[in-house]
């Protein structure tokens, strides 16, 4: 019988912070792309990218709450 790995959450805050950093990087790159190519993008493409950026912002907010929860539980 296999034994499950122990629940090691010691690096959760670091992992979550890395995810936040990457998400913010993607958000900023997307904004730069929209600004650089605004004339070439259709309004649908701009709307899709803007919507995706809004979801990224919501994700970052949720991840920040998760970091707070993790820090409080340690």
From Swiss-Prot:
Keyword Transcription: no
InterPro entries listed in its UniProt record: SASP_thioredoxin-like
Gene Ontology BP terms: asexual sporulation; sporulation resulting in formation of a cellular spore
Induction field: Expressed only in the forespore compartment of sporulating cells.
UniProt-annotated stretches for the region Disordered: 38-74
Annotated localization: Spore core
Top-level lineage group: Bacteria
Keywords recorded for this protein, A-Z: Sporulation
Regions crossing the membrane: none
One Pfam match: Tlp
Family membership noted in the UniProt record: Belongs to the Tlp family.
UniProt protein name: Small, acid-soluble spore protein Tlp
């Amino acid at each position: 019988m296999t034994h499950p790995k122990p629940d090691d959450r010691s690096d959760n805050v670091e992992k979550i912070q890395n995810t936040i950093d990457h998400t913010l990087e993607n958000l900023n790159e997307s904004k730069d792309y929209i600004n650089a190519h605004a004339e070439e993008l259709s309004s649908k493409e701009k709307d899709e990218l803007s919507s995706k950026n809004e979801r990224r912002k919501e994700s970052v907010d949720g991840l920040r709450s998760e970091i707070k929860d993790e820090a409080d539980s340690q």
